[in-house]
Amino acid sequence: MSVLVLLGLGGSAQETKKLSEADSNPRPTFAEADGVRLIDELRRALETENRGRFLKAFDAKRMPGYPAFRDQVADFFARYGEFQVRYHVTQTTMDGELGAEVADFEIDATPRDGVSPNVRKRVALRLVCGWDGKQWKVVDLSPRTWLE
């Protein structure tokens, strides 16, 4: 009988320890390395022409207008291929619980129709990022016109 009581107390202490560890484990600070990881993931997804991988970097629940954005991305991948991407991160900041990154972003793409000329777009791309409990994800992207 006393063994059962001791086991029960050990479980309670362990649960209390887990709760206090969770309370002392704050949301991580958004660092330049986090922003580079995200924008590089977008680059890899484009260069491998993997739309699903591209969209996985975004938080569909928190991103304003995500359904329209998802459709815009689908259209972009349908119209273009053979992407080459270059970027240079120029700014990384954190405002409250959100991180932000600005990068000079350049993309070359080949139209799939075989008739239209190749496209080169250059934009100052701004990513707003939020922590989803496991990793940073893009919760907003501007401008979105480079996907047109």
Predicted features by range, described:
Residues M1-G8:
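Bacterial N-terminal signal peptides
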Residues F30, V36, R51-M94, L98:
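Short solvent-exposed beta->alpha transition segments
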Residues R37, D71, R120-A124:
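A general alpha-helical scaffold signature found inside nucleotide-binding enzyme cores
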Residues L42-A45, D59, Y66, R126:
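Alpha-helical interaction segments
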Residues E97-E148:
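Exposed beta-sheet edge and beta->alpha loop/turn motif
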